Structures are given as structure tokens and as C-alpha cells.
Amino acid sequence: MSNEFTHINADGNAHMVDVTEKAVTEREARAEAFIEMAPATLEMIMSGSHHKGDVFATARIAGIQAAKKTSDLIPLCHPLMLTKVEVELEAQPEHSRVRITSLCKLSGKTGVEMEALTAASVAALTIYDMCKAVQKDMVISQTRLLEKRGGKSGHFKV
């Protein structure tokens, strides 16, 4: 782990990291988030009886779109040409929650961690948005990077 912030320059100002001289490598990141809800809300999603339609399909598309828009949301992120974005949603009735996982890939000069985290986060937010009429006290939690590959810092896995 580095003890320097790469997005802070010598003057202490935020800046976008210059990746011009970095090598193009295969890069991949996986992230997850959870959204906890009442059993009845989760059952409504799982049974497909939600009045707004297929909650998981909508959240999946929202997560994919969010990964592609990460540089518009996070000021110092580079715009990336993603080659793969995958968002999976898993109902976990035993915990009364949904687990969201994301995978982002590309061949490029900078990593895709923020894209993976954004995909998982926005998918969770979309579930909240679609279900808030039924339940307002849902909890989004444990958003984290699970794994990253490629680049100078190498492989990281939780």
C-alpha cells in the first residue's frame, strides 16, 4: 500500500493524474454492495410483483450505465473505454438483502476500480429508488472493492 495520494500535487492541490507514459495493460476490477430490506420488500422483488416492473433488470442496466459514466461523476477519474461491464444481483432471503457484484475490464493505462464501485453503488441506489414507495428504511452498506488486477500496483484481493 502506498502512503502517498496520487491525486494531490506538490502544492497540495487536487489534479488529474498524468497517465501518458504508463503502459497499456489488461485491467480488471470487481466490487460489491448490499441493500438490506424487509422480507416483504425482497419477496416482492423476487416474485416480480413490484408495480414498477423488473427491479433487478433495471438495477443491472443502471449499474452498467453508471460504470460508463464514472468520469462524469467522479471529478478526477479518466474517461475510459470499457470493454466489459457486468452487474449481477443475488437475492439473499436468509439475510433479507440483495448482494450486488460488478466486474469492469479494459486494456488501458489506468485502473477500473472506480467504475466497478460506481456500478455496484448505482445498482443499489436504483433498487432503493424503485422500492422506496414500499419501504423507505432500506440500508445500502458494505460497498467495497473485492479485487483488482493489472497495472503497476499489481493484484489486490480482499
UniProtKB/Swiss-Prot annotation:
Cross-referenced InterPro entries: MoaC, MoaC_bact/euk, MoaC_sf, MoCo_biosynth_MoaA/MoaC, Mopterin_CF_biosynth-C_dom
Catalysed reactions listed for this entry: (8S)-3',8-cyclo-7,8-dihydroguanosine 5'-triphosphate = cyclic pyranopterin phosphate + diphosphate
Domain of life per record: Bacteria
Lyase as UniProt keyword: yes
Binding-site residues for substrate, renumbered to this chain: L76, C77, H78, M114, E115
Enzyme active site: D129
Subunit structure: Homohexamer; trimer of dimers.
Function: Catalyzes the conversion of (8S)-3',8-cyclo-7,8-dihydroguanosine 5'-triphosphate to cyclic pyranopterin monophosphate (cPMP).
Name of the molecule in the record: Cyclic pyranopterin monophosphate synthase
Gene name of the record: moaC
